[in-house]
């Protein structure tokens, strides 16, 4: 039936053939969209990759590629991961079923636009029909970009990048299938529809946030995180913690505005909702029980396995709710790194690991947001293991939750705030200016944060514990 014919029939019938949605005077009146007079949203959506979890599942990915009918795969990793059991098992899985593949290993930790464009150029140079990412969030995000632009070779890089730097266009072609194999218990990128990159010229980060870039399959194998170095485990764990806390305390979906005119453009960062709450809260429970164990005893397989599970769960949570101030304020910190402040990471450039930059302002951020939704902050503190009564005051809730966060930082011996990473009070104006570009994050903070407030949050984060 043609669109014009359908419109003609509906016009003659009065719009709707359902008597339950039409007034008595006209049983064929088209029902209006629910709550059409409101400016805020009224619905939420669930977007997630298929997730496979279990020890040894990396060896199954060859069958997954074959089941897709793919003939030539691009395997993307970085030079450190290339020496791990995760990468070796991924290669073995492809060889077992005779899948033709090539390897791209020139991925930058904390990727930039330029480093992503190298991967994109390689992906475009040959007729790959599927992609596999083996690595942490930097590798997975880079692979998302490579697969997206290889599927849309005519697009300019900024076409799919979000505001304020990109055009936020919808791609003409769907992304070629991507299988993500995470090697850190951290970013949750294996389940999300976002890819983040650094913009050095703007001294901040930006991202691609499109439903079509979520991986076809997330293969989450605990064997792949058992060899994580101590600082990688700490900082990726901080990322999990903030993903869960930020998504659980985000502005509720039905308080977010504007309402989308078309459901196809409903933002990925849609605000906290009943589905994201389940995943975020369970991630917090796991973190409260296993985070310290996973750091202080790296041979504790149960703790490392559970933290990997928390990473994926928090990814599902924030992938459907969003993150707010911790992430929004983190991007200028890591983008403007003055030195390499962490062992266990490559030293080829100044580097502040993403998880550390996110955690640096967390205490100030949650002190600020507690009053906006004290019940959410109370539940967060309790779920992390704090003994706090349900009738606690806002001040007590804030202090208890933030003491938990300080405790992790102090116990793990990480740099103490912005000063511990080489920043001074004189840098706050520059950080604040760059943070103003983190529009999608700051927009779903449960409490509105203007430039003056952001500056204050940075100032309070100069020293944390």
Curated annotation (Swiss-Prot):
Reaction equation(s) it catalyzes: (S)-3-hydroxybutanoate + 2-oxoglutarate = (R)-2-hydroxyglutarate + acetoacetate; 4-hydroxybutanoate + 2-oxoglutarate = (R)-2-hydroxyglutarate + succinate semialdehyde
EC number in record: 1.1.99.24
Keyword Ribonucleoprotein: no
Location of this chain's protein in the cell: Mitochondrion
GO molecular function, one term: hydroxyacid-oxoacid transhydrogenase activity
Top-level taxon of the source organism: Eukaryota
Cross-referenced InterPro entries: ADH_Fe/GldA, ADH_Fe_C, ADH_Fe_CS, Alcohol_dehydrogenase_Fe, HOT
Alphabetical UniProt keywords: Mitochondrion, Oxidoreductase, Transit peptide
GO biological process, one term: glutamate catabolic process via 2-hydroxyglutarate
Pfam families: ADH_Fe_C, Fe-ADH
Main enzyme class: oxidoreductase
GO cellular component, one term: mitochondrion
General function of this protein: Catalyzes the cofactor-independent reversible oxidation of gamma-hydroxybutyrate (GHB) to succinic semialdehyde (SSA) coupled to reduction of 2-ketoglutarate (2-KG) to D-2-hydroxyglutarate (D-2-HG). L-3-hydroxybutyrate (L-3-OHB) is also a substrate for HOT when using 2-KG as hydrogen acceptor, resulting in the formation of D-2-HG.
Family classification: Belongs to the iron-containing alcohol dehydrogenase family. Hydroxyacid-oxoacid transhydrogenase subfamily.
Protein's UniProt name: Hydroxyacid-oxoacid transhydrogenase, mitochondrial
Species per Swiss-Prot/TrEMBL record: Caenorhabditis elegans
Gene (name only): hphd-1
